[in-house]
Amino acid sequence: MARVTVEDCLENVDNRFQLVMLATKRARQIATKGAEPMVAEENDKPTVIALREIAEGKVTRDLLLEEDDD
């Protein structure tokens, strides 16, 4: 996927607000907690990787229910 759009992501989440929360949490996991990306990195930043994962259905809203290990 060359470019990720909000519409691509909204097929897998309920609304834009949930999308922001989900992408933020997943990007933090990738950037600071060492989580392995579930899509090819292609030299993208963690936020773009997170959005691509959401658009491809590899990250779901269930992630929001998980407790943070801070």
UniProtKB/Swiss-Prot annotation:
The keyword Magnesium appears for this protein: no
An annotated Gene Ontology molecular function: DNA-directed RNA polymerase activity
Enzyme Commission number: 2.7.7.6
Biological processes, Gene Ontology terms: DNA-templated transcription
Key words, A-Z: DNA-directed RNA polymerase, Nucleotidyltransferase, Transcription, Transferase
Pfam families reported for this sequence: RNA_pol_Rpb6 (PF01192)
Catalytic reaction annotation: RNA(n) + a ribonucleoside 5'-triphosphate = RNA(n+1) + diphosphate
GO CC, any one term: DNA-directed RNA polymerase complex
Subunit structure: The RNAP catalytic core consists of 2 alpha, 1 beta, 1 beta' and 1 omega subunit. When a sigma factor is associated with the core the holoenzyme is formed, which can initiate transcription.
NCBIfam families: rpoZ (TIGR00690)
Role according to the record: Promotes RNA polymerase assembly. Latches the N- and C-terminal regions of the beta' subunit thereby facilitating its interaction with the beta and alpha subunits.
UniProt similarity note: Belongs to the RNA polymerase subunit omega family.
Protein name in UniProt: DNA-directed RNA polymerase subunit omega
Organism: Marinobacter nauticus (strain ATCC 700491 / DSM 11845 / VT8) (Marinobacter aquaeolei)
Lineage, highest ranks first: Bacteria, Pseudomonadati, Pseudomonadota, Gammaproteobacteria, Pseudomonadales
